[in-house]
Curated annotation (Swiss-Prot):
Keywords assigned: Hydrolase, Membrane, Protease, Signal, Transmembrane, Transmembrane helix, Virulence
Membrane-protein topology: Multi-pass membrane protein
Protein name: Membrane-embedded CAAX protease MroQ
A Pfam family it matches: Rce1-like
Principal EC category: hydrolase
Phenotypic consequence of residue 141 to A: About 90% loss of hemolytic activity
Matches recorded under PANTHER family: ABORTIVE INFECTION PROTEIN, SLR1288 PROTEIN
Recorded GO MF terms: endopeptidase activity
A GO CC term attached to the entry: membrane
Major localization listed first in the record, in broad terms: membrane
Active-site residue numbers: 141
GO biological process: CAAX-box protein maturation; proteolysis
Length: 247
């Protein structure tokens, strides 16, 4: 399969997995559902579709006969995948903490992404959703935003690699941020996209940003489920430190 077809199918499958549940529940036998029953039906359908989408996307991309120049370059040895992923995870968490402090100063009060809040509410009602938020979601997003959007742009832009990286990263990270539909948190998602793209280019392995993304999502969801008050205290302490250095 050519890379163009694989990329198009990857994006189409991802979009369908997002919106098909809403169309399916409008049909029999779901029309009799309402309230929490309807919500659960949508979520369970989406979980199944996500799993099918992830499996299909992986298989499609394994069939590519003409990989990008980046994918043909010498990759980091497999033994360094986890160390690089852990480093990337640390960078993402530090970045999020710094941006959260800035957002708190701008908007006042503890800032929590509405997107994250929705995921936490669903995870409390349907625990298996944690697996999909932590594993399947990041896998799908990295194939779409890093491998397809970033990868194709980086491959298409000729000349200076730094310029190509900046353009491809800016475009893919902005789309990644806008896709999360949290206007105030665009800087958070944009920065995450930059780190994921950097990890991909540096290691030449998509597995690295996928694992970083999985660790980040898993940590945030589990942390907020188990100890939501700890997040508030951590934010207050960070703000205290901020005011020491910047009165």
């Amino acid at each position: 399969m050519t890379r163009l077809w694989a990329s198009l199918l990857t994006v189409i499958i991802y979009i369908l997995s997002q919106f098909l549940p809403l169309l399916i529940v409008k049909k029999l036998p779901f029309v009799q559902y309402s309230g929490i029953e309807l919500t659960k039906a949508v979520i369970y359908i989406q979980l199944v579709l996500f799993l099918i989408a992830a499996t299909t996307i992986i298989l499609i991309n394994l069939k590519i006969k003409n990989p990008t120049k980046l994918e043909l370059e010498v990759k980091e040895p497999k033994k360094y995948i986890i160390p690089w992923a852990l480093l990337g995870f640390a960078l993402v968490m530090i970045y999020q903490m710094v941006v959260s402090i800035v957002l708190t100063q701008i908007y006042g009060g503890q800032q929590v992404s509405p997107n994250t809040e929705k995921l936490i509410i669903i995870a409390r009602k349907i625990p298996i959703f944690i697996f999909f938020v932590s594993i399947i979601g990041p896998l799908l997003e990295e194939y779409v935003f890093r491998k397809v959007i970033f990868g194709e742009l980086f491959n298409a832009i000729k000349g200076n690699r730094i310029v190509a990286f900046i353009i491809a990263t800016t475009v893919s990270s902005l789309i990644f941020a806008l896709a999360h539909n949290d206007f105030k948190f665009i800087p958070v998602y944009f920065g995450m996209g930059v780190i994921f793209s950097l990890a991909y280019v540096w290691t030449k392995r998509l597995a690295v940003p996928i694992i970083i993304h999985m660790l980040q999502n898993g940590f945030v969801v589990i942390f907020q489920l188990l100890n939501p008050e700890a997040l508030k205290k951590a934010t207050e302490q960070a703000n205290f430190i901020y005011h020491i250095f910047i009165p």
